[in-house]
């Protein structure tokens, strides 16, 4: 008699963020959380297609308000967070970002059933290296992005949440037109694939502990 091993139950996944999570200008299948789930399954990690709460242009405060409005009562096996570029773009302070990011981390952990080890944060891409930023002070943008990312990283360390630094990958995309969508600002599937590849081993470690 052949024994059939039942499939492992899917691990629910919630992705929180802004244009970089929704994949502005790219196909839905190219969104980095969707690619992460697709990469995880053949590795024996049955990650479900993600629920996504994200919109182009959102700051930390706007994401938090949208989460409240969504009134999502589910608990997830994995929650991702990538947010902050619009805080920097609008000239908001790092101190305000830190405060609001800390609150979002708490929200993400709540969605993960209070388990910090089921939350992963991705760093803010450096839009100063995009075609959209031509004529702007790229060095100043890079400095500010680094400051925002340092604040996020420190908050993750305090909360014992995993932090994945994808910013170098976005900087390396400079000058490669195939890495950007038609608006010259957002990223195509190949760039977001790199984020998913970089995040996969972190998620594997977290969910197999």
Each predicted region: which residue ranges?
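Serine-esterase "nucleophile elbow" of acetyl-processing enzymes
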Residues: 1-56, 66-73
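Catalytic His-Asp segment of secreted/periplasmic serine-dependent ester chemistry enzymes
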Residues: 126-209
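Oxyanion-hole/transition-state-stabilizing segment in secreted/luminal serine hydrolases
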Residues: 60-99
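Short, solvent-exposed loop/turn segments at secondary-structure boundaries
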Residues: 24-29, 91-95, 140
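A short acidic, helix-capping loop that chelates divalent metal ions and anchors anionic groups
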Residues: 22-24, 61, 87-91, 128-133
